[in-house]
Amino acid sequence: HSFPKGIIRDYPDYSIRGFMIDCGRKFIPMSYLQDLVKIMAYYKMNTLQVHLNDNGFKQYFDNNWDKTYAAFRLESETYPGLTARDGSYSKKEFIDFQKQAATNFVEIIPEIDIPAHSLAFTHYKPEIGSKEYGMDHLDLFKPETYQFADDLFKEYLKGDDPVFVGKRVHIGTDEYSNAKKEVVEKFRAFTDHYIRLVEGFGKQAVIWGALTHAKGDTPVKSENIIMNAWYNGYADPATMIKDGYQLISIPDAMVYIVPLAGYYQD
């Protein structure tokens, strides 16, 4: 008897094979996230982006920002009371989750989504919300806004054993108003600031594609920056590649699943 012999080569076409889950609009239990990592590993997916904050649309809440649902899911000692009461993750379990995922060759990319999608933060600290563009927008003209967000990111980035364990951190940066040139320039400066903040802690910054929608003169760092290209109207892929960004293509109409939303071909 003889056994056939040979070489099997198994390798991916794409270095990042990812999935994003929105834990902001709806709480996702840690046990579910742990199971999801195991399933991803089985299918040789290697990146899970965990969207830690978001909010609903005010038109579904009597057009009242105060009534509109919003949540931030991670324990915060810097801002006691910020963390959602209807479901959250302790720092310890989030650290353990990231380390366990790494043993399955899955990198967790935590996302704190600012300066839009930020109602959880303005519910906590109303004075940093934008009266002009909506309370789900941080007011980019106030120094207090930067102080708040700086301290929040630093809580999870600093120290020898930081809460954000992996090599990448997502800073959000999508769907902010472009109604006026001055606010566009502020948005671009804000984006650049938080790219450099996370880089200062040795992390690679990941951003949502928004710089076509927010076209302006203020430079935004592109070297070694990953951009989630989700809609061409917000970030034209050809332009973004020319500008030096590394793109991950996630076209919303084809890959987003938003239950009962009605606007993603579901």
Regions found by a protein language model. Give the residues of each.
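Active-site neighborhood of glycoside hydrolase catalytic domains
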Residues: 121-226, 230-245
